[in-house]
Regions:
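P-loop NTPase motor-domain active sites and their immediate coupling elements
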Residues: 26-143
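Residues in soluble alpha-helical coiled-coils and helical-bundle/repeat scaffolds
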Residues: 15-22, 76-80
């Protein structure tokens, strides 16, 4: 979490960089509420996504990017709550203009469930120590 603290104070942050896992859970809860609010607004306007909304309105709805530096730390402190928020966001947030960048050193199912992993369209892995970790990251198995 120290890596992201260097970004503290840049002008486009919606909130300060959060380094406490408990506070991160409450912020993720706010992001879920924001996503639901955006869905209600887009439904009222009759559009399917943020791009459609922004084409119809002078006051554009901004995109939100949520960056989670170490998912396993969050899962240790507030596992089920974090899992529920991330799962909901990974399934529905893109249309509302909310995107998640999530990092972890351990891509195992106790950190990132199969449902969450299936809803992230892109994965990047720099280096793994053993081959089975490649399968966990890329979510495929050789039979």
């Amino acid at each position: 979490m120290l890596e992201l603290s260097t970004y503290e104070g840049i002008p486009h942050l919606l909130c300060p960089v959060i380094t406490e896992a408990k506070r991160a859970a409450s912020v993720l809860g706010w992001v879920v509420k924001e996503m639901e609010s955006r869905y209600r607004l887009m439904t009222r306007v009759g559009v399917r996504n943020i791009d459609g909304y922004n084409e119809k309105h002078k006051l554009s709805m901004p995109y939100i990017v949520v960056i989670v530096d170490e998912m396993s730390d969050l899962m240790l402190v507030a596992g089920k709550e974090i899992e529920n928020y991330i799962q909901k966001l990974s399934q529905m947030a893109r249309a509302a203009g909310i995107h998640i960048i999530m990092a972890t050193q351990r891509p195992s199912v106790d950190v990132i469930t199969g449902t969450i992993k299936a809803n992230f369209p892109t994965r990047i892995s720099f280096q793994v120590i053993v081959q089975h970790l490649v399968h966990q990251v890329l979510f495929y198995y050789l039979f």
